[in-house]
Regions:
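Blade-level signature of beta-propeller repeat domains, shared across WD40, Kelch, NHL, RCC1
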Residues: 390-435
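Surface-exposed loop and turn segments in beta-propeller and other repeat-based domains
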Residues: 43-48, 93-109, 162-169, 209, ...
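Short, conserved, GDST-rich strand-edge loop motifs in beta-rich repeat architectures
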Residues: 127-145, 328-343
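Loop/turn-rich, solvent-exposed surfaces of beta-rich toroidal or solenoidal domains
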Residues: 277, 283, 308-382, 386
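Beta-strand-rich domains and repeat architectures in extracellular enzymes and scaffolds
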Residues: 45-78
């Protein structure tokens, strides 16, 4: 068994540690990779719920310990799938068309659940639907608009909560159940909207938002979102007003990055005021004080989560029960050990300001999907993995969502085929699942 070698270096004034060797694990051959693996068990998400083996940022852990994943079935429908970590069984929790009474096909279909699933204090799970893509020149259908939906795991009941904005999909839903408020972001035009849960009368409340913007609700009950100019918009429900603060780096510069590179992914800490932010096209982790006063708020750089070329992090940012911030970043594989890309898991410790690269995520049960059989059958959309020189199966193109469960288990979604990967290495107790 080989020893792990920790190489420490400083990024943005913070200590970063990379683990560059590995112990013996399943899947290794005679060759030794120059990095450690983080092993996960893969589960093929119900194939009848997708068309192109894909889903997006939509994943959460319910209060019952089960995992809920949104899927995309272009031109047809979308679904919320429930995964039970104990039985390892899956089932459909939401059939969007059935719940909302939708009948559209092609571009008119409710083809994606793309929202980051929001779990209310009641345990109810809030999601939204949006359009997919046109398939061919004959698809001239108009998209009617997306719906907000809620699923109650206790009652096993889903409800439609209306269409916030005709002809626009829903890219984010957050619920302040204490104040009976729903926050919604639309797409492809990013309107920031609000409604009372009791009457579902949606209205715009503030400036236009950045692409794929999400709402964080702080400890004071205020909603926060990133504007189109990459500033901080804060809605105070007591005053029914929005305040915008400029987001600046410590040297006074704007954090604005144009286009998809700047897409923000952020989470809020248990203190109800600290937000951690990671953008799609870079690997720098920032913290923001959502309760800061004044005309601007400082985005403090905490360091580089994963060092490498062409960083790409999707919805893979989460906080574990240990208080650590976990992230996955895809980088170009420049190690000489295989080609393509590597999806690296890292974590940040707020107490020590230390970043640790934990390793490349890898699949320990390579037989979870029969790639050769699918290829022989002419199946498309199965190109999302590659095999490294030691025989290890690892993601190639796209990771999407990541959540940390209450027991410390990490769950990651991967495209092509659409996969749920369960990482047990950081679990602190038995699987946390209730009936």
């Amino acid at each position: 068994m080989k020893k792990m070698i920790a190489v420490a270096f400083t990024v943005c004034g913070m200590l970063t540690v990379s683990i560059v060797a590995q112990t013996t694990e399943p899947g290794q051959g005679s060759k030794t990779p120059p990095f450690k693996y983080v092993w996960g068990k893969a589960y093929y998400i119900l194939p009848e719920t997708t068309s192109d083996e894909s889903g997006y940022f939509s994943m959460c852990e319910g209060l019952n310990g089960r995992i809920y994943v949104g899927t995309a079935k272009y031109c047809v429908n979308s679904y919320l799938v429930e995964f039970d970590p104990v039985s390892e069984k899956q089932r459909i929790a939401i059939d969007t068309h059935k719940v909302c009474g939708a009948t559209g096909t092609g571009y008119a279909a409710q083809a994606k659940i793309h929202t980051r699933n929001y779990v209310g204090t009641s345990g109810r799970i809030y999601v939204g639907s949006k359009q997919g893509y046109r398939r061919g020149t004959n698809d001239t259908a108009s998209y009617p608009g997306g719906y907000v939906m809620v699923y109650d795991p206790v009652k096993d009941e889903a409800k439609c909560l209306g269409m916030p904005y005709p002809e626009l999909g829903v890219i984010d839903v957050s619920a302040d159940e204490a104040r009976k408020l729903l926050y919604v972001t639309t797409c492809e035009t990013q309107n920031w909207m609000i409604a009372k849960i009791d009457d579902l009368k949606y209205r715009k409340i503030g400036p236009m938002l950045f692409g794929y913007a999400t709402t964080l609700i702080d400890g004071k009950g205020r909603g926060h979102a990133i504007t189109r100019e990459f500033n901080l918009a804060t809605y105070d429900p007591e005053k029914d007003e929005v305040k915008v603060q400029t987001i600046k780096s410590p040297d006074g510069k704007s954090l604005f990055l144009e286009g998809s590179a700047g897409i923000p992914n952020w989470i809020i800490a248990p203190d109800g005021r600290t937000a951690y932010l990671l953008r799609l096209g870079e690997a720098t982790l920032f913290s923001l004080d959502l309760q800061a006063e004044g005309e601007s708020v400082t985005a403090k750089p905490l360091g580089t989560m994963v060092a490498g070329e062409n960083p790409d992090s999707r919805g893979a940012l989460t906080m574990g029960p240990d208080g650590l911030v976990y992230a996955i970043v895809k980088i170009n594989n420049k190690t000489g050990f295989g080609t393509g890309s590597l999806h690296v898991l890292s974590r940040f410790d707020p107490k020590s300001s230390r970043i640790e690269e934990l390793g490349v995520i890898a699949v320990k049960n390579k037989d979870f999907f029969d790639f050769e059989k699918a290829k022989a059958a002419g199946k498309s959309w199965i190109h999302g993995y590659h095999t490294l020189p030691d025989g290890t199966l690892t993601p190639l193109h796209c990771h999407m969502a990541m959540v940390a469960a209450k027991d410390g288990t990490l769950y990651v979604t991967i495209l092509y085929p659409f996969t749920l990967l369960r990482i047990d290495a950081y679990r602190t107790e038995g699987l946390n699942v209730t009936k």
